[in-house]
Regions:
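Glycine-rich phosphate/adenosyl-contacting loop at the front of the ribokinase-like
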Residues: 1-74, 95
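General beta-strand structural signal in soluble alpha/beta enzymes
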Residues: 6-7, 77, 161-163, 193-194, ...
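Active-site metal-binding loops of divalent metal-dependent hydrolases
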Residues: 10, 165, 259
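Conserved beta-alpha-beta core of the PfkB/ribokinase-like small-molecule kinase fold
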Residues: 133-213, 230-231
């Protein structure tokens, strides 16, 4: 099943609890953050998984680390930050259709922003099938330099980079600033995954095939575009196609894209990248993404290998 190494942000997602009153508003904390979600999703699917990141020496940092360790994720490369630096909190609001919005509460700097190049070691990346990261750590240093260090080491070790863009426009000074920082990492990536709402601001098109062609022209080998309820699109230099979604009752879409990517990467760890294999990777990705939407929290409904097999086979 290979080894997936994910690095970047990890946060505590905060959801409203049950039975609020006029004088009490209960909340439930759940671990989150795209790279951490990918690591957990990969581990549940039977892959070896490691996470490189930074959390506070606080209640939420302890909670997140314990959750990752219970899932079988190697956390030996996670930095702990002393106060006043804290683990970031993301308050999640869920709409009626399962979509969500986030309000972040962070110290300045936040623990996840202090991931540094020194935290990214050759030993952690050695033997990996894929190295995965997104764009949020690229917003500022030292986390930005840590991502570049990971990409550099991955190149030296011949480990493919899987870049899940995960673009959050409100976190950047401008779209242009994001494009300038993201571009060099795209050029170092073998796989790039985006959602359909990210291709327009970053690539200037709303067409998935056109966006994929632009990325392939920059040296990317494989592009995935997740299309929400429409499924997913995939493309290489030789072929392209799409797979349908799996209908489910959506409770919370948080982590669906991370589940998609993890399932695809785990499957691609085992086989040559011919058209049949890539199509199956996309199909399994859409299935994992659908299952991830059926419970609250980014990690709550991430499927095991057996659960994914039963679901895709109609069981």
């Amino acid at each position: 099943m290979g080894k997936i190494v994910a690095l970047g942000e990890v946060v505590s997602d905060i959801y409203r609890g049950e039975k609020p009153s006029e004088v009490e508003l209960p909340f439930v904390a759940r671990p989150g953050g795209a790279p951490a979600n990918v690591a957990v999703a990969a581990a549940r699917l039977g892959s070896e998984a490691a996470f490189i990141g930074s959390v506070g020496e606080d209640l939420f940092g302890n909670f997140i680390l314990r959750a990752l360790e219970i899932e079988g994720v190697d956390t030996s490369a996670v930095r702990r930050c002393d106060p006043p630096t804290r683990t970031s909190l993301a308050f999640v609001e869920i709409t009626g259709d399962g979509d969500r919005s986030f309000t972040f509460y962070r110290s300045d700097p936040a623990a996840d922003e202090l991931l540094s190049p020194e935290d990214v070691s050759r030993d952690t990346l050695r033997g990996a099938t894929f190295v995965n990261f997104g764009s949020i750590p690229l917003i500022k240093d030292p986390a930005r330099s840590a991502i570049h260090r990971a990409a550099e080491l991955a190149g030296e070790l011949e480990v493919p980079v899987a870049f899940d863009v995960n673009f959050r426009e409100h976190l950047w000074e401008s779209v242009e600033a994001a494009q300038e920082v993201v571009e060099p990492l795209i050029e170092r990536s073998r796989i790039v995954k985006l959602s359909d709402d990210e291709i327009s601001p970053l690539l200037g098109t709303e067409d998935a095939a056109e966006a994929a062609r632009m990325l392939l022209d920059r040296g990317v080998s494989l592009v995935f575009v997740s299309l929400g309820p429409e499924g997913a699109f995939y493309a290489t230099e030789e072929f392209e196609g799409d797979v349908p979604s799996y209908p489910v009752q959506i409770v919370d879409a948080t982590g669906a894209g991370d589940a998609f990517l993890a399932a695809a990467l785990v499957y691609l760890s085992e086989d040559e990248w011919d058209e049949e294999t890539i199509r199956e990777a996309a199909r399994r990705g859409t299935a994992a993404g659908a299952l991830a939407c059926t419970e609250y929290g980014a990690m709550g409904a991430l499927p095991t290998e057996d659960e994914l097999e039963r679901f895709t086979n109609g069981g």
